[in-house]
């Protein structure tokens, strides 16, 4: 079991060799993270989408102002996620656990999948301490959700505790890495020349505070077997040239229902939500 102390904060699942320049960059990144931590929680409260609109000025940022207004017509709420390099993974984790809090059957299946992933990681050669620390820590957390020990307010308190939240994130980083390694033949051709998949996973996926790139995003979505939609504030950022992108790829917009929807602003992801569909009430019988 992991002790919930700041000394145990994860930095990577493996040992990364760094140069002096890289250490300087890491120090600069950590300073930015510390500044961000002082300014915002890891996971914010749900807020009306009008909050997003208020961030942009019609005169100085007309394109973003227009897009924010368009989103506010489709989505009712936004949950801001701290921009610390973990925002995509954190948003996915929060969005998924929100679903599981209200879907016991899916929660039971998810726990079984997490335990299976622990075995898969061991077979892939991940260190035993990695699996016992990060995997067991996450599974214990999600089993407490299943058993009702962690209620919604407890879950969000944990998500906002640096001493525990980042251990939970490491499990998602590990299964992302594991999925890529299981499908190395499919993903290795997309890496920069001279970089092996093992190196990529160690430095870009398993290392904390690293932003998720396209390969990491696809791998996590597939590892979790979920469907997501990413809405883009910048119309030029979507891979298909549109205003949003569905994952896994190949789903038609008309039939695609995402489990989780993210908002991508340059370099950052937040969660956005549609208003729950209203249940139609039966018509009253005519008065005799």
UniProtKB/Swiss-Prot annotation:
NAD found in the keyword field: no
Catalytic residue list: 84, 87, 244, 268
Sample GO molecular function, one term: ubiquitin binding
Residue numbers binding substrate: 175
Disulfide bonds: none
EC number: 3.4.19.12
GO biological process: protein deubiquitination; proteolysis
OTU domain span: 76-275
Keywords: Hydrolase, Protease, Thiol protease, Ubl conjugation pathway
Reactions catalysed according to its record: Thiol-dependent hydrolysis of ester, thioester, amide, peptide and isopeptide bonds formed by the C-terminal Gly of ubiquitin (a 76-residue protein attached to proteins as an intracellular targeting signal)
Keyword Hydrolase recorded: yes
A Pfam family the protein falls into: Peptidase_C65
Family named by the database record: Belongs to the peptidase C65 family.
Role of this protein: Hydrolase that can remove conjugated ubiquitin from proteins and plays an important regulatory role at the level of protein turnover by preventing degradation. Specifically cleaves 'Lys-48'-linked polyubiquitin.
Protein name: Ubiquitin thioesterase otubain-like
Organismal lineage: Eukaryota, Metazoa, Ecdysozoa, Nematoda, Chromadorea
Encoding gene per record: otub-1
